[in-house]
């Protein structure tokens, strides 16, 4: 899956999970500061990404995923 395809899928999941417009979601958007996620939203978002991409994101890794771009890079690395 290309980086662009991953970004689009992540953007769609984030939009649905956080009830924000997909057009507002940029690679450098911070889940909490820019998109209004709280800690529970972040946990649910990680779970949704794990399910959508059929990967496991350990807690230590999840703590380092704070932006849309971080999520895309992590998923891209897991799939290669």
Swiss-Prot record:
Modification(s) after translation:
4'-phosphopantetheine is transferred from CoA to a specific serine of apo-ACP by AcpS. This modification is essential for activity because fatty acids are bound in thioester linkage to the sulfhydryl of the prosthetic group.
Q: In which pathway does it act?
A: Lipid metabolism; fatty acid biosynthesis
One GO BP on record is:
lipid A biosynthetic process
> What are the Carrier domain coordinates in residue numbering?
4-79
Q: Is Transcription regulation among the key words of this record?
A: no
Which positions form S-S bridges? none
Which InterPro entries does the record associate with it? ACP (IPR003231), ACP-like_sf (IPR036736), PKS_PP-bd (IPR020806), PP-bd_ACP (IPR009081), Ppantetheine_attach_site (IPR006162)
O-(pantetheine 4'-phosphoryl)serine modifications at: 39
> What does the UniProt keyword field contain?
Cytoplasm, Fatty acid biosynthesis, Fatty acid metabolism, Lipid biosynthesis, Lipid metabolism, Phosphopantetheine, Phosphoprotein
Which protein family is it in? Belongs to the acyl carrier protein (ACP) family.
Give the protein's biological function. Answer: Carrier of the growing fatty acid chain in fatty acid biosynthesis.
Which protein are we looking at? Acyl carrier protein
Organism expressing this protein natively: Prochlorococcus marinus (strain SARG / CCMP1375 / SS120)
Q: What is the lineage of its organism?
A: Bacteria, Bacillati, Cyanobacteriota, Cyanophyceae, Synechococcales
